[in-house]
């Protein structure tokens, strides 16, 4: 009895108390208070409650239609991301222990109030697009850092424009909405993220996008919704009627937010601004990478970002494009394949050339008549080696900001030399600074001075068949000769004026080849000479041992005059040079080779002679010793045989007693 009473008193009994069902209903299906405060509580205590809940609200709710009054349910705020690891199915709610005992969870009011204030501050300041986040993300990529420094003030102004619509879109009336079937609020043109997706857009992102979508409501391009749950990822999809399109320069343009879904998600059409048409790629687009963050930037090969030529739209375009592009964390996750060069020096831009190496190992310069071979004064972009399959789709308008005073006709295609390369097409674009500073073309090969960069080294190492003179490679003479031979063989349209910087060493090399003897003739002469010398040493080795002043015959080492001897064949029939030059070149080479061979032969002769003398001395010593030993044994045997003529009855065991038969020295 005492043990059972102790269990009842301590609450460790097997039977749970009666008020257990109401908290469990609230924990699993979520009453208004728990759904509103669950996101604001500590992540480890999402099911805690501030006070008792009326039983009418808990029993009257159905499992699939619980009322959700939390703005985080609709907007997918970062607090919802914190609750994502807690959504794993558990057999018991956290309000019960392993024995089934009810453990009341008390919320912490101070943390709740603090988190509410933090959420309000984030909503007011649009924390998702704050400059701090951009600076933090741009610290990892130099290209984004330059753009952030240029677009700092307009970006902050553009983010503040989204505050008026934020309160209406972030806190709509949701008394009759369920967490599974979420209806978009007033002023919201996009479907909300379902509650089971933890990577939805935050309230500040949705508010800013709603404000931008209202500005681009009268857009002539087809507008569609964004696929929910893409985690804020953006990607340009090829449109049907946007191939070869250029923005209308006469009509005022309002660039909407570039808001498209990942290519791998179903129902992901496109919503884009007037001044940002997309060029369709020749290959299917790839979906967003699964390992990237919620705000990563998806790049698509083959899409060209073309800015609006109207200079009046520059500040607003800078804000919107910077907000949609450079606030994402894709600059650090994907490495931002294309780096924007913001230098505005015309002389520097005139000296630089742009080169993109295709993944198939081929690249060619676009003809001057191509409309895409135009560049603004804002700079150009350089493709990094090894990353050409992912072409950067940055639409920074920093270059256009410096052209407010210029007429729209100066900007032909875009603010910066936007490049795109479809995989397998083998076509690259070249921007040479401002349209007024376009380099003159002398055919497919253009001689421009540029220091060899990493992209050029990549092209050279990969053995790509491109115009080397376009980049003005300055390499060693041998490499330049090889490149020149390739250009002559592969490019018949080459003009002589385009290669003034490269020295003409082809004719010199051909002359040197003509002066040199043929390789086959050299091999034959060397083999015959070696055979003759070997035969001489083998046949006259005995004479060399006898004669101390042995020397090779002078006729063999040095033939008389310049006439080719038996070891040296006549001039090669393949030589097309001057016979006099060939005759002059042959004796020099012959004499040099013979001198080296003679010195080596002399040294070898002395060594061989010394070795033979040593071997002969050793042989004499060995034979003399053997003879002395044999004579000593014979003498000893004779003495023993003469001394023992009389037969002894018992032979002595001394050393003189040798049994008859073969002597022991013959057995040696």
UniProtKB/Swiss-Prot annotation:
PANTHER family recorded: BREAK REPAIR MEIOTIC RECOMBINASE RECRUITMENT FACTOR 1 (PTHR14583:SF0), UNCHARACTERIZED PROTEIN C19ORF57 FAMILY MEMBER (PTHR14583)
Biased amino acid composition, Basic and acidic residues: 114-125, 208-251
UniProt subcellular location: Chromosome
GO cellular component assignments: chromosome
Positions with biased composition (Polar residues): 166-180, 305-316
UniProt protein name: Break repair meiotic recombinase recruitment factor 1
Bias kind Low complexity: ranges: 279-296, 391-400
Keywords, comma-separated and alphabetical: Chromosome, Meiosis, Phosphoprotein
Known partners and oligomeric status: Interacts with HSF2BP (via N-terminus) and BRCA2; the interaction with HSF2BP is direct and allows the formation of a ternary complex. The complex BRME1:HSF2BP:BRCA2 interacts with SPATA22, MEIOB and RAD51.
